[in-house]
Amino acid sequence: MGTSESTYGIPEENMLSFLPDFIFQTITQIRPAFLREHGIRLLLMDFDNTMLPYTTDRPEQPLLDWIAGMQDAGITLCIVSNSHKQRVPHFSQQYHVPCVTHAAKPGTRGIREAMARYGAAPQQTALVGDQIYTDVLGAKRAGITAIAVRSIHNHTVWLKLRHLLE
């Protein structure tokens, strides 16, 4: 067995692609000082179940305060979502947080589009999300920092099973 293989025959670098760099309970626990300490100036955010539950379009005040605090601290925020629904662009317009939809995570197209929009290098960029197989893996594939948070709401049997496996 070569040095790059795990005991399961999967290359170790592929196994590590599923591990986030940092874990927080909620997105609002991430602080501007933490991001600056790690050289992050662009924070890409998954939308559904990271920022808001699927079941609502109305953010709670702590999220709005967090967004304002990040923006006041000079952290650029951008939603990067796989969603095809209008709720993401609607939120984006209403609360002045830009977005990239149809991002196709774990592919890197949407992530790279957001980075290009703001002129951010991979080492200056992080993506926060609630799903290992889309958000964390997409971040790792793009060469950026991956931050995992607990899913706000598991509303379907499929999501409950998927999060249990993760």
What residue spans do the PLM features occupy?
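Asp-based, Mg2+/Mn2+-dependent phosphohydrolase catalytic module
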Residues: 2, 7-45, 52, 56-57, ...
